[in-house]
Structures are given as structure tokens and as C-alpha cells.
Amino acid sequence: MNSSPESTLEQASRLLAAAGSVAELDQVRVRYLGKKGEFTEQMKTLGTLSPEERKEFGQRVNQARDEFQRLLERRKAALEAEALARRLSSETIDVTLPGRGQRLGGLHPVTLTLRRITRLFRSVGFSVVEGPEIEDDFHNFEALNIPAHHPARAMHDTFYFSEHLLLRTHTSPVQIRVMESGQPPLRVIAPGRVYRCDSDLTHTPMFHQVEGFWVDEQVSFADLKGTLYEFLTGFFEKDCAVRFRPSYFPFTEPSAEVDIECVICDGRGCRVCKHSGWLEVMGCGMIHPRVFEAVGIDPERYSGFAFGLGVERLTMLRYGINDLRLFFENDLRFLRQFKPF
């Protein structure tokens, strides 16, 4: 190789200074320090020199190569600093801009319905009472005149922990507990979660109910009809037709199912009401004397009515929701439709 280590270093220094990026810098490094680089080739010539020349020339090559590496590292650090400065400059934050407000959430539609129901009943003098979700056999069945042979006690309808401990199948046990601890007049609703061994397109193992009752002297079926009519017209915000159909519940006598004129088609008939023009919304009746006897209230002196409704069903009717599973899938596209604004 004809060039000296010093001239090679001078040439390499100019190329290092001219490199505009780390990639170009790496090309210069390979040109001088690679397997076929110029400093590498100079070291290969040492074998052709005499011992005195070899020592002197080897020192010069090593010094030039070390200096090149020092210049290379310094130039690399400078290029990296410049690149970082450019990136930071492009990402500059304008601290004078207004901050982003937090996205407002909304309540679940079932929660909205529960609040609406409790607000309407409170407005006519009902108190709201909650009770335990794990109940005993007495409060969930026996005190409500549901005998041991009743189908509701079967394993396929009820979640049992033991022979006498279970997940409540309705919120009516709250009615029993309230009547055990107090004397009439009593006017109470009991909202909450209930559980049944049932899971299909229209049923879930856990759902929400609101059960209510009114116990006092001379409470009649007319009071029941008037209370539920006022509630339903207030809930749906329209003067809808209401009808009572005879039915059977162990804890009420007489008992009735409550239907309203379909709020979807206004009674003309549609898929939701199965083209009948009517929708079943709740069950009700006059409290059975045996229920009063179980809690120590004189059925000769006092009378009362009770009712129960499914919160999910009323929610679906109020908001026009046709799939029960939407309540439990946590799909934000669905839930954000119920934001207050």
C-alpha cells in the first residue's frame, strides 16, 4: 500500500466529518477498519518489512487507527445527539394548549332503570330496603307459603349451598324480614340481584328484580291497581292501557299478571308483543293470610298487596333493546348510548 498511515488518517478524518448520518458513518468505518479496510491492509504489509521498519511502521499504523476510532466515536455521538434533538424538536409540546378533559362515562341501562323505579315509588311514599343475597329456606320459601313440594324448590330452579342455605330466587325475602322487624303500616320496595338456574336467550342465571308491598288496614285490590297504574304510566311516560289477568302465586291470593299495551307498536301487534298487542310486565296480588301469620301480623286486622317486576325486561321495553345478552357483554358501543349527554 503506497499511502502512509498519516495520510490515510487525514483522508478518513475528512470522510468522518462529511458523514451526515450514522449509516454513512458506518460505511466509513467499514472502509478503514473492515476485513479489507485500509488500516487492515497496512497491517498486512508488516510481514514484508525488516524488523526495525516493522516496529516503527506498526506503531504508526496503530496510532493512526486508534485516532481514527476516537474520531469515529466522537462523530457518532455528535450525529446521535443531532438526531435526538431533531426528534425532540418535532415532538415539542405546546404547554399553552388547553388540557384534554376526561371522557364522561354513563350509568349502565339497568342501573338507570333501577334508579327510575325507586324514584317513582319513593314519590308515592315507599321506602327502599335491601336484603342479603344468600338466604335461608324459611325467608325465601317457607314464610312465603311455598311448600316443600313446590317446583321452585327443585335443584334445577335454585342454587343451593346446603339444605337450608341458598341464593335468593326473588327479593320477596326482604318483605318477610321487614314485616318481622316492624308493624304496619308498611310501604316498601326491595330492589336487588336474584339468582335462578336458568340460562338461555331470554334468561340469565343472575338478574335484577324489584318487589314491593303495602300493608295497612283496609288495603284493597283497588289500591294495588291504582299504585301499579300510576307507576307504569310514570315509567313509560305515556298513558298506556293496563290490564290484570288472573294468575297464581303461592304468596298472594288473589293473584294477577299485569300486562300493558305494547309500547313498541301501541297495541297494533309486532314481533316484540308476539302480535298480541300486549306485554306482560309484572306479577302481583293481595298478600296471602299465611304469609301474615308466618311473620306475626294479624290477617284479620291488616291486609296488603305485593308485586314483583323484572328490571331487565322493563329496561328492554323502555329503551327498545331486543337482546338480553347486551346487558352483560360490556360492549362500549352499546353502553355509551346511555351517557347523560
UniProtKB/Swiss-Prot annotation:
Its cofactor is Mg(2+). It is found in: Cytoplasm. One of its GO terms (biological process) is phenylalanyl-tRNA aminoacylation. Its main location: cytoplasm. It catalyses: tRNA(Phe) + L-phenylalanine + ATP = L-phenylalanyl-tRNA(Phe) + AMP + diphosphate + H(+). GO terms for molecular function: ATP binding; magnesium ion binding; phenylalanine-tRNA ligase activity; tRNA binding. Its EC number is 6.1.1.20. Binds 2 magnesium ions per tetramer. Tetramer of two alpha and two beta subunits. Belongs to the class-II aminoacyl-tRNA synthetase family. Phe-tRNA synthetase alpha subunit type 1 subfamily. HAMAP family: Phe_tRNA_synth_alpha1 (MF_00281). This is Phenylalanine--tRNA ligase alpha subunit. It comes from Methylococcus capsulatus (strain ATCC 33009 / NCIMB 11132 / Bath).
